[in-house]
């Protein structure tokens, strides 16, 4: 599971998810990737489930890059507890994802394998995504 080694504050405000992603909108490391089309929180468990789905389908071929990190703690109060009496205990970690952000990248496999692996990974995520190639977004191809 992905989580920060240490944080300055154990609890954070929820914040707003307005606008599009500022950075990380292009495929830099691999040849193929999946790009978020919606804004959402993605938990560390969902990221891990997507990673496992991809790597199992690729059967140890190729390389996977995870471009998001769950650095935001979210809290929850126990069930059947009255309102008030402070903020709840930290429950888990989430990555804030905005539209346009590339979530995962793959290289070292054919386009068909990459497309299917990323499709399987996208089913583990709570948002709509689209398959993107390095050339489509405007970067240069690695093949030279």
Swiss-Prot record:
GO cellular component: cytosolic large ribosomal subunit
Annotated HAMAP family: Ribosomal_uL16
Name of the protein in question: Large ribosomal subunit protein uL16
Record NCBIfam families: rplP_bact
The species this protein was found in: Bacillus velezensis (strain DSM 23117 / BGSC 10A6 / LMG 26770 / FZB42)
Purpose of the protein: Binds 23S rRNA and is also seen to make contacts with the A and possibly P site tRNAs.
GO molecular function, one term: tRNA binding
CDD domains given in the database record: Ribosomal_L16_L10e
Keywords: Ribonucleoprotein, Ribosomal protein, RNA-binding, rRNA-binding, tRNA-binding
Family: Belongs to the universal ribosomal protein uL16 family.
Any GO BP: translation
SUBUNIT field: Part of the 50S ribosomal subunit.
S-S bridge residues: none
Highest taxon, organism lineage: Bacteria
Encoding gene per record: rplP
